[in-house]
Amino acid sequence: MLTGSPVTKEHEPVIITIRGHTPEVHPESWVAPNATLIGRVRLAARASVWYAVTLRAEAEPIDIGAGTNIQDGVTVHVDPEYPVRVGAGVTVGHNAVLHGCTIEDGALIGMGAIVLNGAVVGAGSTVAAGALIPQGVVVPPRSLVAGVPGRVRRELSDAEVMANRDNAAVYERLVELHREAI
């Protein structure tokens, strides 16, 4: 049962309290005006949630780490006993789906990728665009995963792991452009 109504001010995201839980948005984070945050959502400093994103946490929490970017059209959802934890410096590409999973620090989830309940994507890993990480699969750190179902193709180089971090830093800088525009 919803216990509050959405906040729908112009140029403000939709924030919905559910079961007494209101999303917690760190003052240094940024949420696009048409994003929707529901329930037990927590955003750390410098996290960014872009346009048309839904973070829906009525059963378990969604924690988004510092400097992480959740790009346009992403859906993040939980199930009972399956929270979502996204580490620091993570990039979640456009239209990806994170469902009841853990994404460790510095990972990159490609556009349109799907990560299902209980899956863990290791630190510094890249999940290719359109890949599917099935329920319960654990991806080792620094792995490149591609395919449906996703399979580890190889270990990432130091340069590739750094490129993932650099991508997250680019989005931290883009936030200022969008804050000024709105």
What are these regions (language model features)?
Residues L2-E24, E58, I62-A66, D72-V74, ...:
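Glycine-rich hexapeptide-repeat left-handed beta-helix
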Residues H11-V49:
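N-terminal segments that cap or nucleate solenoid repeat domains
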Residues T36, T68, T91:
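Ser/Thr-centric signal marking residues that sit
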